[in-house]
From Swiss-Prot:
Swiss-Prot/TrEMBL catalytic activity: UDP-N-acetyl-alpha-D-muramoyl-L-alanine + D-glutamate + ATP = UDP-N-acetyl-alpha-D-muramoyl-L-alanyl-D-glutamate + ADP + phosphate + H(+)
EC number: 6.3.2.9
Record protein name field: UDP-N-acetylmuramoylalanine--D-glutamate ligase
CC annotations in GO: cytoplasm
Cellular compartments annotated: Cytoplasm
GO biological process: cell division; cell wall organization; peptidoglycan biosynthetic process; regulation of cell shape
UniProt GO molecular function: ATP binding; UDP-N-acetylmuramoylalanine-D-glutamate ligase activity
Database matches in Pfam families: Mur_ligase_C, Mur_ligase_M, MurD-like_N
Length: 450
């Protein structure tokens, strides 16, 4: 009798896990308390996988020997409390896929509160340009479980969220990257920053002295936590202050990086499509990761020039009468806005707001005072933004739709200014998600420019 596996959640990771489970011959059942999309229903039916939607049937779920949980389901969900009370093993889709991975596959795993998507995409781009057989997965693109059913890659570059890391146990990366840790998603961690930090550090679990780990060496949270939780692997630092005996350093004009033969290679940052200190950190991390699995440093550097970042991340949309419009809708916390403002070279009209996560806007006060002359508060309830920025800028205005926000921002901007959408907040008060918010911004700007 085959092992019974229940998949909780029917997004890309859940359906991918279900398809892999079925392919491996397990008794597979999918349960989602929400409605499953038509496309995913068709896939499940074609594969002969039983499922339910709009409900969690306790009897069916609690009869499982193994549960693969989608990352969006919190531990406080009633069904999870029941599962935990029965001591049924719960793992993530990544962990499930890892347990069925083909021998010899290597993993580059990347996490961080900010920058992980860009760094993951860039690392994948470098290796693909250099001819590696490389897959992209995790919190981005196609689920790892789906990928390994029919296709075997030599290397997988994975973006991993804290939610995914929480349910990973035997997974081991060959190269593990932790970019930074700033407060985020604390509602999932009992509002304790130390719990969130511990979750991020799971990226280093099971590393051996033959493996590599990469961090931004000036991140005080990472450095402090490392003192009590040392990592047993080869350290490859990324720094904006100095060049260590390994890793990479940027003075913002250049990047210096150790090659495999330990020679130091220097390149000019002006050659890269990604600009700003935060992006130099991302570039150095990606280069270090590629070099750590054997990539040629010179070819890796050259490949970056053809990279195009994912949408909604400091995406230049266009100019209207000399005013630049930049879409940074993915900036859903204060730290992301700090990085965005730090990269700005012109005076800024800042569109900010949405569903506040308990933000402390004083963290960006110095940069706002230096670079921003007008704030446009965009949201249903703008009270926290209005009070948070009132003492920082000469002008602060309210908008309750993207159309209104762009009109106000454009009217407030002078030739040579930049209108920056970098909200620092979640989007679901006025928009479906951050992509919807960014897409509306982009489309309206293009329409105005036309």
């Amino acid at each position: 009798m085959s092992q019974k596996i229940v998949i909780l959640g029917s997004g890309e990771s859940g359906v991918g896990a279900a398809l892999l489970s079925k392919a491996k011959g397990y008794d597979t059942f999918v349960s989602d308390s929400s409605m499953i999309t038509e496309a995913f229903i068709a896939e499940l039916q074609q594969a002969g996988i039983a499922f339910e939607q709009g409900v969690h049937s306790e009897e069916k779920i609690l009869s499982a020997q193994l549960i693969v949980k989608s990352p969006g389901i919190p531990e406080k969900a009633p069904i999870m409390k029941l599962i935990r009370s029965k001591a049924i093993e719960v793992i993530s889709e990544i962990e499930f896929a890892y347990r069925h991975i083909h021998p010899g596959a290597k993993f580059i795993a990347i996490t961080g509160s900010n920058g992980k998507t860009t760094t993951t995409l860039l690392t994948h781009h470098i290796l693909a340009q250099l001819g590696y057989s490389v897959g992209l997965g995790g919190n981005i693109g196609t689920s790892l479980a789906r990928q390994i059913i029919h296709e075997k890659k030599d290397v997988y570059v994975l973006e991993l969220s804290s939610f995914q890391l929480d349910d990973m146990y035997t997974f081991k990366a060959d190269v593990a990257v932790l970019l930074n840790i700033t407060p985020d998603h604390l509602d999932r961690y009992e509002y304790k920053f130390e719990n969130y930090t511990a979750s991020k550090f799971r990226i280093f679990q099971n590393l051996t002295p033959a493996d590599y780990y990469i961090t931004y060496s000036e991140d005080s949270v990472i450095e402090s936590y490392k003192k009590d939780h040392p990592v047993d692997a080869r350290y490859v630092p990324v720094s904006l202050k100095q060049l260590y005996s390994a890793g990479a350093y940027s003075d913002e004009k250049t990047i210096q990086i150790h090659a495999l033969d330990d020679t130091v290679v220097t390149c000019n940052t002006e050659e890269f499509p990604l600009q700003g200190k935060h992006n130099y950190i991302n570039i150095m991390a990606a280069l270090n990761a590629a070099v750590s699995i054997g990539a040629d440093i010179h070819k890796s550097i050259a490949s970056i020039k053809s990279f195009r970042n994912a949408p909604h991340r400091l995406e230049f949309v266009g100019s209207i009468y000399g005013v630049k419009f930049v879409n940074d809708s993915k900036a859903t916390n204060v730290d992301s806005v700090w990085y965005a403002l730090d990269s700005m070279k012109t005076p800024v009209v800042l569109i900010v707001g949405g569903v506040d996560k308990g933000n402390d806007y004083s963290q960006i006060e110095a940069l706002v005072k230096e670079k921003v002359h007008t704030v446009v508060a965009l949201g249903k309830d703008n009270s926290k933004v209005l009070s948070g920025f009132a003492s920082m800028v000469s002008e602060i205005k309210e908008a309750h739709s993207m159309v209104e926000a762009i009109r106000i921002a454009h009217d407030s901007a002078k030739k040579g200014d930049t209108v920056l959408l970098s909200p620092a907040c979640a989007s679901f008060d006025l928009f479906k998600n951050y992509e919807d918010r960014g897409t509306q911004f982009r489309n309206l700007v293009i329409e105005l420019a036309g």
